[in-house]
Amino acid sequence: MKMNKKIVSMLVALFLTISALSAVSGDGSDPLDPSDGGADWDGDGLTNAEEQNHGTNMNNADSDGDGLPDGWEVNNGLSPTNGGDANGDPDGDGLTNAQEYAAGTNPNNADTDGDGKNDNVDQYPTDPND
């Protein structure tokens, strides 16, 4: 009878342990766990898991300190770990990436709104009807 109580106690403990482990939510607290990297602690547009993949800091929206959020850099083909990206001009429109970010324009398209005027001379570079 004592052996049965021990077995039952061990099974209950095992059940409680397994239940606790399966209750962990995907809150982004473990960026190395592919099923638990969905949070974006620093609000830069990259999930914690993506931060891990890009080698950026999940607690710093601008890991390289260039004034451009990591997510914006990644989404525009720039490097979130290269502080020199802010001064680049990949589309050749005369605006730096930092200026493109501030204006809300596309650093890879000289005419973001498609109105025939390059962003650097367009008074409303995001309004195709200007």
Can you say where each PLM-predicted feature lies in the sequence?
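Extracellular calcium-associated, cysteine-rich motifs in secreted modular proteins
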Residues: 24-130
